[in-house]
Amino acid sequence: MAEADIAVIGLAVMGQNLILNMNDHGFTVCAFNRTVKLVDDFLANEAKGTKIIGAHSIEEMCKKLKRPRRVMMLIKAGTPVDMMIDAIVPHLEEGDIIIDGGNSEYTDSNRRSEQLAAKGIMFVGCGVSGGEEGARFGPSLMPGGNPKAWPHLKDIFQKIAAKSNGEPCCDWVGNAGSGHFVKMVHNGIEYGDMQLIAEAYHLLSKAVELNHDQMAEVLDDWNKGELESFLIEITANILKYRDEQGEPIVPKIRDSAGQKGTGKWTCFAALEYGLPVTLIGEAVFARCLSALKDERVRASKQLPRPQVSPDTVVQDKRVFIKQISKALYASKIVSYAQGFMLLAEASKQFNWNLNFGAIALMWRGGCIIRSRFLGDIEHAFQKNKQLSNLLLDDFFTKAITEAQDSWRVVVCAAVRLGIPVPAFSSALAFYDGYTSEVVPANLLQAQRDYFGAHTYELLAKPGTWVHTNWTGTGGRVTSNAYNA
């Protein structure tokens, strides 16, 4: 008998919590997992006493679904998703819906959307953010794919999503792989935010020489203002935490950061579309550098470092703490500006017609990068839907103008003390490049023409490309002989 509103495949913690969330909001969910024992265990424990039902096969699961059938997968990205889709499709009919709620690459979602459309099945790639707690009590959801599926999913998704000022942190993103693209950029920005906070922590520790309680107090104070965010909040909590010996735990953690690859995907997309998403790139590379722990230990003993006392660089600690907060805020503005540049380019490339204000709202609650700051981004795009860059919005122009001097002081101080701040400094370099009427790319073009005859465009004659015989002795090279 068809009784379930939706099926969820994958009973790891995220899948279980999303099912329980749906149940809390009055939806009947059919739970399925390849390992049938997990279904029985879930029904006997976490789901006991609820309306949640289970299935021991894909065929049974599909028979228990109301039409149009809605099947959501929360399984490992890549080949497992394709294999599961292949197993589900024979049991579906035209007009049924498959939702991929995993961390899939947007290119895979583009392909799956097209392939399933040819079979009459509607595909939705849905970014899900917020971790285990978000899945249970309200995630940020970013659905994209076949727009005809949205009316059949909207009620479920918007009810289970996090709320910000009463508005659900979920809306339709766009066609094909747009939902997973937006989630990918979200994850890239998350990498950037985490690296910026890590650099601020490093400066507070090494340049201002604060202890963990003092640093936690500073972050608690930051969390009352423009930097208010989930990541600042949890960082303060981390710094307050004490282990069994009553000591701060962070200094005891090996300083070698892992990554699952979604930050790299953002960088790959930025390179593919020719966009300078530099801060996220530096955040990824900072993790790569951190992984060279043994080499760094050897290098720290062999290679020279600045012999400068923090007291000679930071004369007023209270002032410098304020300057760090301003540098963090300015760098954060640049990071989000770069992220939305990438979203805008993908929207143009794929004709997705993304609503950037709505995306900012989706991120305001339930997800890892949720913050007060996103409300300002939402307002910027609501005010000017054609805004080409966040830096050009009046609010952010004013904010970065006020922060600029502090930003430069902090980066210079870090350089003098030998404290690595790749995210702060790359954000500042981007800002200086973006605000420069002339950059030395004219010399790059001359070099390319010299060794490769790639030609260059003249300022006085836009659209006119010329080649110079730089040596005057013949010996020209051709652009097809060397391409750079």
From Swiss-Prot:
Positions annotated to bind substrate: N103, S129, G130, G131, H186, N187, Y191, K260, R287, R448, H454
Residues given in the record as NADP(+) binding sites: G10, L11, A12, V13, M14, G15, N33, R34, T35, I75, K76, A77, N103
Entry keyword Disulfide bond: no
GO terms for MF: NADP binding; phosphogluconate dehydrogenase (decarboxylating) activity
Top EC class for this record: oxidoreductase
SUPFAM superfamilies assigned: 6-phosphogluconate dehydrogenase C-terminal domain-like, NAD(P)-binding Rossmann-fold domains
Catalyzed reactions per annotation: 6-phospho-D-gluconate + NADP(+) = D-ribulose 5-phosphate + CO2 + NADPH
Catalytic residues as annotated in Swiss-Prot or TrEMBL: K183, E190
Assigned keywords, A-Z: Gluconate utilization, NADP, Oxidoreductase, Pentose shunt
Pfam families found in the cross-reference section: 6PGD, NAD_binding_2
Domain of life: Eukaryota
Single Gene Ontology BP annotation: D-gluconate metabolic process
Pathway, per record: Carbohydrate degradation; pentose phosphate pathway; D-ribulose 5-phosphate from D-glucose 6-phosphate (oxidative stage): step 3/3
EC number, UniProt record: 1.1.1.44
Annotated GO CC locations: cytosol
Listed SMART domains: 6PGD
Gene3D superfamilies: 6-Phosphogluconate Dehydrogenase, domain 3, N-(1-d-carboxylethyl)-l-norvaline Dehydrogenase, domain 2, NAD(P)-binding Rossmann-like Domain
UniProt xrefs under PANTHER family: 6-PHOSPHOGLUCONATE DEHYDROGENASE
Record's function text: Catalyzes the oxidative decarboxylation of 6-phosphogluconate to ribulose 5-phosphate and CO(2), with concomitant reduction of NADP to NADPH.
The protein's assembly and partners: Homodimer.
Family indicated by similarity: Belongs to the 6-phosphogluconate dehydrogenase family.
Record protein name field: 6-phosphogluconate dehydrogenase, decarboxylating
